[in-house]
């Protein structure tokens, strides 16, 4: 075996089928597009969501709700997330560094979900009644 004779194993490579290259290729003349019609033409295909002139579903259904611009600035943290953190004094910066909340978060709310067994001190965070009770029961505090 020499470097100039190396080639892939049989069946390892599938060559792209070239269409429109004569009768003998099996995909000449119409190139697998059939005869006439919009889909046989070059550039002949409809837009995504086009339903042949019928009013599209996206326009038939009413508009509903809105997307709050405040969403990226708010975040919720579970007690189980606090349990997993290596630090005991928890503020927004500690949560961002641990990747628990997004970089844009400004208002963080701790909710009662999961269990907390270690003593933690919250600074600058909002806690729900249940979460506050659970934190204090574990010997921690909410400042």
Swiss-Prot record:
Keyword Nucleotide-binding: no
Record-level GO BP terms: translation
GO terms for cellular component: cytosolic large ribosomal subunit
Gene3D superfamilies documented for this protein: 3.100.10.10
Region ranges (Disordered): 1-52
Compositional bias per record (Gly residues), positions renumbered to this chain: 21-31
Gene Ontology molecular-function annotations: rRNA binding; structural constituent of ribosome
Protein keywords: Ribonucleoprotein, Ribosomal protein, RNA-binding, rRNA-binding
PROSITE patterns reported for this sequence: RIBOSOMAL_L15 (PS00475)
Domain of life, source organism: Bacteria
InterPro entries in the cross-refs: Ribosomal_uL15, Ribosomal_uL15/eL18, Ribosomal_uL15/eL18_sf, Ribosomal_uL15_bac-type, Ribosomal_uL15_CS
Subunit structure: Part of the 50S ribosomal subunit.
Function: Binds to the 23S rRNA.
Cross-referenced PANTHER family: 50S RIBOSOMAL PROTEIN L15 (PTHR12934), LARGE RIBOSOMAL SUBUNIT PROTEIN UL15M (PTHR12934:SF11)
Protein name (Swiss-Prot/TrEMBL): Large ribosomal subunit protein uL15
Lineage per the UniProt record: Bacteria, Pseudomonadati, Pseudomonadota, Betaproteobacteria, Burkholderiales
Gene name of the record: rplO
